[in-house]
Structure formats: C-alpha cells, structure tokens
Design a protein with these regions (language model features):
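Conserved PLP-binding catalytic core of the aspartate aminotransferase-like
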Residues: 143, 151-184
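PLP-dependent aminotransferase class I/II
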Residues: 76-154, 158-161
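Short beta-strand-to-loop capping motifs
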Residues: 99, 170-172, 205-207
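PLP-dependent enzyme catalytic core of the Aspartate aminotransferase-like
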Residues: 182-183, 192-224
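Structural motif
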Residues: 18-22, 52, 96-98
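Active-site pre-lysine segment of PLP-dependent enzymes
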Residues: 4-15, 27-86
Length: 224
C-alpha cells in the first residue's frame, strides 16, 4: 500500500495537469517517504504540474513533516489543512489551504459561497490555536495506543496495515461494520476506496478504554 517510485515514473511519463496526494495516506495511515515526496515536488515544479497535498492528518503523526518550507520555491504547491481533524471538530467543518498561487486563490474565492465559514467555526478555530499542548498530548496517546490496537486486531486474525496516523486499516469478515453498528460502534467500511473490497475497514485509535471496548465487540462479532 506504500507509494513507490513507479508513481514518480508515471507522473514523468503522463505529465498530468495536477497531482493529488494525501500525507499520511487515507485510509492506510502511512506517511509518504520524505525523499520520494521531495522528488515528486521537484518533478512537478520542473514540468509545471500543480501538486495538491492533503496534510489534514499530518499534525497527528509523530514523524510527519509538512511541505510548508517548499512553498517558497514551488508556486504550484497547494497544501490542505484542517482544524476538524487535528482538534476533533468535524461538525464545524473548518479548514484552510496554503499556496503562493495568488491567482488560483482569487479564482477559488470567486467560486466559493459567501459566509462559507460559520461564526462558531471561527470561534472554535481561534480557541484551538491557543491549545498548543493538546496536539502533543493527542500524539502521545496515539503513539502509545496504536501498536496495542494493531496487535489486538492481529490477535483476532485480522490483517492490519502498518500506520503512522491516528487510524488503522484492516481486513476482516464482510458485514462487520453492520454487526458493530447494532451495538453502537461505527467503523468505516472501505470498499469504496480504489483497490479495496468488501471486508476492509478503518478504525480510529482512541483512548485505552474505548479501544478495549472496540476489541471486545470485534471479538464477539468474529466469534473469537
């Protein structure tokens, strides 16, 4: 599931107008190799290809490094960020982008609806910026709990994809999501992702007691 050099070769060969990447990947949670990502950025800059990079989950990884320093030398780089992911504010829908392409920003501004960021979302965003210690605490929990959750899933016989993020991709019995829903637990079925089929799911890495509740429900659902 890791992005490889064949992708770099494909970009060089096909020369698309734009490249869209997600770092870390969703739904695998794997970070793109920094060297490879730098080469992709260099190639896109050389060929005049826009590079759109989703970094919405990057702040919740321990090893992830933003491409923000490359904005200075790559006008075609476009970074996507979100308070909703880093601070758990999904219902408020607050995100932003970073780019040197002012012409593109003006075009985007002309197409967006007026008042596209609500007052509650603005207030929550300002408050979140003051919570500098929160992200580190969140990362500490994720780094501690992710290997435990992955090991528990493997112990149930599920295939688990290595992850650097706050979620795990695993394969198990089909219909597992519906079984868990009946006991009040939601996991993300991933059959609609390219290359995945029924039986692939994504789960969040949460607090210890919540992860234990998930594993207990999975154990019962799988008859283990």
């Amino acid at each position: 599931f890791a992005l490889g050099r064949d992708f770099l070769d494909a970009v060089a060969r096909e020369a698309p107008d734009a490249v869209f990447l997600c770092n870390p990947n969703n739904p695998t949670g794997r970070l793109i190799d920094p060297g490879l990502l730098g080469e992709i950025a260099d190639l896109c800059r050389e060929k005049g290809i826009r590079l759109f990079l989703d970094e919405c989950f990057l702040d919740l990884t321990e090893q992830g490094r933003s491409m923000k320093p490359r904005l200075a030398d790559f006008p075609g780089l476009f970074l996507l960020k979100a308070f909703t992911k880093s601070y758990g504010m999904a219902g408020l829908r607050l995100g932003y982008c970073l780019t040197r392409d002012h012409a593109l920003l003006r075009r985007m501004g002309a197409e967006t609806q007026p008042w596209n960021v609500s007052v509650p979302a603005q207030a929550a965003g300002v408050a979140a910026l003051g919570e500098r210690a929160f992200l580190q605490r969140a990362k500490d929990v994720i780094e501690s709990e992710r290997p435990k959750l992955a090991a528990a899933l493997r112990a149930l016989g599920f295939r688990v994809v290595p992850s650097d993020a706050n979620y795990l991709l695993f394969s198990g019995p089909t219909g597992l999501d519906m079984t868990l829903r009946r006991v009040g637990i939601a996991i993300r079925p991933c059959a609609n992702y390219h290359g995945l089929t029924d039986g692939w799911y994504r789960v969040a890495v949460r607090l210890p007691e919540e992860n234990e509740q998930l594993i207990a429900a999975l154990r019962e659902a799988a008859g283990r």
